Each structure stands twice: as C-alpha cells, then as structure tokens.
A protein has these predicted regions:
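Terminal targeting signals and extreme-terminal segments of soluble enzymes
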Residues: 1-155
C-alpha cells in the first residue's frame, strides 16, 4: 500500500485537509491524497502515549480512520465529506514512542454512489504497526454537529 501512493504522485487531485479541531490537537499532518489514496503522519509526543509509554490504541485507530476517510473522500471531492459506518482494526506491534513518527496510508478499493470501502496501514519506519478496513458513507449536506446543535437547542 505504501508504494501505491508514491507511484501515483503525478496524477493526484488533492482534497483539502479535514477541518477538525481534534486532529489539529493531535498534530496530524496531511501529506498526500488523491485517486483513492492518502498518506498522513504523526510525530509522536508524550501526549500520544498510554500508561506503558507506547502509542495509545485510540491514536492508532484515529489515524487509520482518518486516512481511510481522506482516501475515500478523494474519489468524490465534490461531496461534503464521509462518515465511518464500520471499522475493523488489527494491532500487530506496539506503535512507537515519543520522538518517533507514524505514517498512515489509506486506499479506497471499492465504491458505489453512496458508500466507499477502504483499507489502511500504519508504519513506524519499515515496521507494520496496525491494519484496518472500513466502510464509509458519502455525505452531501448537513454536518452532524450542525444537526445535533439543532436537536439539542443550541441554535
């Protein structure tokens, strides 16, 4: 999967990075996307660690989820976005320590007009850390947050 992205650089149509305060707080870097593929990275700090001082599994799952969403979204840049319907994650090795860097690679392998099916992996250098598969639904309109504010009476 890693090499697929590098081999496609010339033909990619970039999708704007996701405007997400959580991802900004984590420090996620959006490096490449287009043609159903994506690459993001995270420079690890103490805040990304669990009690054993290795990368927290929730951080790894977030990277996998986001890189698959960006890959799927790159096939339909005219859509508002995608939401995760289902995700399966396999943790293969501990995910890195402060000062390290994780690279996540995503690929959309099948799509319909409303759904996209993706796979992703995270690497720490050459070490394969985790893999995932996910199903995503394309959205055209209202953001879930906007809808929830209306339901909860915040607007």
């Amino acid at each position: 999967m890693k090499n697929d992205i590098n081999n496609q650089q010339g033909s990619q149509q970039q999708v704007p990075p996701i405007d997400n305060p959580f991802l900004t707080m984590l420090g996620v870097q959006f490096l490449e996307n287009g043609d159903g593929q994506a690459h993001i990275a995270l420079d690890l700090t103490e805040q990304h660690m669990n009690s054993w001082q290795i990368t927290h599994g929730g951080v790894l799952m977030t990277l996998l989820d986001v890189v698959m969403a960006v890959a799927g979204r790159s096939l339909h840049p005219d859509q508002k976005g995608v939401v995760t319907v289902e995700m399966k994650t396999s943790f293969l090795q501990p995910g890195g320590v402060p000062g390290g860097r994780l690279d996540a690679y995503g690929k959309a392998f099948f799509q319909s007009s409303t759904m996209c099916f993706c796979e992703a992996e995270i690497r720490h250098g050459e070490r394969l850390i985790a893999k995932a598969m996910g199903t995503f639904k394309y959205l055209k309109q209202l953001r879930a947050g906007e809808r929830m504010r209306k339901i909860c009476g915040s607007d």
